[in-house]
Amino acid sequence: IEKFFGEKELNLSATLDGVSAYKDADYVVIAAPTNYDPVKNFFDTHHIEDVIDLVLSVNPEATMVIKSTIPVGYCRSLYVKYAQKFTKMEPLPNGRRREFRLLFSPEFLRESKALYDNLYPSRIIVGYPKMMGAEWEEENEAIRQIQGNHMQEAAETFAKLLIEGAEGLSADNPIMEQYKETKYIPTLFMGLKEAEAVKLFANTYLALRVSYFNELDTYAEIKGLDPQAIISGVGLDPRI
């Protein structure tokens, strides 16, 4: 990290003042902690909503992008919450409507590899508000009422910013050729809930891999086997 900041010409500034940070921003990336409580079985998301409230009070036209790990359905629930909140507020002058501009773009950072994984991302995923089936009509109606204009375009612009800041990947794999225009970084756009689910299912799959190989190690110990030899042999299967 020190080498990167020392050698790269970067236009960065830092502040602890949220008002000055948000007032002229086109995009506000929210990466607040959302600690999971296994006893209560929920994510503590109040830090995210604290940031959202401040952004809306300072720069309501900014597009907010949540990066934090959140439960599936959380972003759409925020559209419902703020649609209800907006109806109780004083109308804006000249008949203008209050807008809520929220996207979700999960991060896939490994421990101690955050800078590398930002420069060489495995994929970029951006979720934006899309209409769902009739059973989700309350959410759909809230989105219709308050979503900002051109949210899909806002998602595409944000992805371009991430690509611009990345170093990019190599095109050794012919499958990656389709992503040539995005520096060979797979870039996907989808609904908010789908993007939230991608993050959680990826985490779950990685946890299952760890659990599986822990079981393998336990079995090898009981049977007097060399676990590393087994893992090496299993891992050579291209499907694994």
Provide a role label for each language-model segment.
Residues 1-240:
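Structural/interface elements that position substrates and couple domains in central-metabolism enzymes
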